[in-house]
Amino acid sequence: MSLQYQTGFGNACATEALPGALPAGRNSPQICPYGLYAEQLSGTAFTAPRAENRRSWLYRIRPGVQHLPFAPFAGAQRWLSDFGRQPVTPNQLRWSPLPMPDAPTDFIDGMHTWGGNGGPEEQSGVGIHLYAANRSMQGRFFYNADGEMLIVPQQGRLRLATELGLIDIEPYEIAVVPRGVRLRVELLDDVARGYMLENFGTAMRLPELGPIGSNCLANARDFQIPVAWYEDVEGDFELIAKFTGGFWRAPIAHSPLNVVAWHGTHAPYKYDLRNFNTVGSISYDHPDPSIFTVLTSPSDTPGTANMDFAIFPPRILAMENTFRPPWFHRNIASEFMGLIHGVYDAKAEGFAPGGASLHNCMSGHGPDADTFEKASHADTSQAHYIRDTMAFMFETRRVIRPTAQALASPQRQDDYYQCWQGLQKHFDPEQA
């Protein structure tokens, strides 16, 4: 089925699956249309500034409070929120893609935490995860009280059946599910693999554009929000909650995806990365990678993000007398990269779609030896067309602490450092 969407990042939306289900003129009437319950879902404090306030009013068949008590849940064993306090290696790290599971595995049980920082109780930091699944969630629903979830598919399409409507995403698209929104993740293909970032901090937003002006990068009009959809289903289900880093399970006798109408600003959304309006230099030098930012979560320090989500999409390089690939770099921020499709222009070999790399604070990184040699002798009088690629980066202000399971993973490339060992010494004090 072809899904319908509303458009516009951060818009105050209003949608109903049955005519007249949205109360007119008030949020909480004495009796709601169709015998529905009114429930507010708050994503920010009541007193948050209006421009940053996130809340939605839901009109649902049964209220969200109706379920049996929670008890600890034994699943999701590889989805972690405790990133430890042990010293972190400064070595550059890289991993090959996760293999697809052999046993039946859904989105929740197929999540593998690769690293993170901060935590849900601090309301700051991130969790970074890879997922690999081969079946839809069956008889279970999930919500994350710890943070919003940024889902980046690399292989296989997903349907996110949420309280506020349906979202379909495929590779090259992303979705963000706000804190607390209940959902069921369905596979639209036989298998699915990708990346997921948990943002424990301030909700993601579009970056400020500064001198770029009022257009470019990710344009607000291209973000899509679901329309109201509901299912009125009863049965023996389980509601799984992620709360303060732990997982909990509550029996529930009906589907919680029973919101017939809603209005507000706290809602899931999707975005097609192919719509990103890339900017760059048309004279010389490679600008800072902040020009590729899609979404950002601000911190309490102006100009310094809790986390940024940036992409490296197809683009045209026109800079003359310039080393065009991303330059060698040591950064106060920490960078986790993934590859959705193709080849990343700074790494000719070893970085495969579905793989990942981690370059932490002040750990050197940059193009491998082969890329450096080719770019150093390229004809920069001609434009270079980078096609058939899509890489991305999760950048955080804090050090990303890799988990023990990531460090011990058979997908870890222990020889990653070798890609720079072939860089030659070209220094000649007699020749400028």
Curated annotation (Swiss-Prot):
- Annotated Fe cation binding sites: 329, 335, 365
Q: What is its EC number?
A: 1.13.11.5
Which N-terminal stretch is annotated as signal sequence? none
* Metal-binding is among the record's keywords: yes
Reactions that this protein is recorded to catalyse: homogentisate + O2 = 4-maleylacetoacetate + H(+)
Write out the GO MF terms: homogentisate 1,2-dioxygenase activity; iron ion binding
Keywords, alphabetical: Dioxygenase, Iron, Metal-binding, Oxidoreductase, Phenylalanine catabolism, Tyrosine catabolism
- Binding residues for homogentisate, per the UniProt record? 344, 365
One biological process term from GO is: tyrosine catabolic process
Known InterPro entries for this protein? HgmA_C, HgmA_N, Homogentis_dOase, Homogentis_dOase_bac, RmlC-like_jellyroll, RmlC_Cupin_sf
Associated pathway: Amino-acid degradation; L-phenylalanine degradation; acetoacetate and fumarate from L-phenylalanine: step 4/6
Q: GO CC terms for this protein?
A: cytoplasm
NCBIfam families linked to this entry: hmgA
**Oligomer status and interactors:** Hexamer; dimer of trimers.
Query: What is the purpose of this protein?
Result: Involved in the catabolism of homogentisate (2,5-dihydroxyphenylacetate or 2,5-OH-PhAc), a central intermediate in the degradation of phenylalanine and tyrosine. Catalyzes the oxidative ring cleavage of the aromatic ring of homogentisate to yield maleylacetoacetate.
Q: What is this protein called?
A: Homogentisate 1,2-dioxygenase
What is the primary gene name for this protein?
Answer: hmgA
